[in-house]
């Protein structure tokens, strides 16, 4: 991808560049990937996305590549070990949230058929393409992000904010 087509935030770091060129704005209906993004965004709260991208491999290793069913079965002892030993952000609440989110995601899968069906249902399976001219125009949240956040909280997903 040519540099003029890249977002300015992506060009100074190889992890952000790879993420930008292969994942940013690429629609996904893969439950495992969406579950990973949910949890990485939760881990990022109060921190930088760059930091989380640099620790992403460690997160994937610690959480079975975000296998929802395996994450739902994590014990308190296993979660404590992850906090102590894994090369991730050392926040017990954020680590515990992965199991909580997995359990909630399983409930969503039963009700909606998949986590992707649930998430994409907010947009009637349509992509939203914004036409921001610069980073200064991008809002911290939107009416839709607020709605999704509220609904996610209602299904017990923790540490999630728009």
Where are these regions (language model features)?
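HhH-family (HhH-GPD) DNA N-glycosylase catalytic core used in base-excision repair
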Residues: 1-162
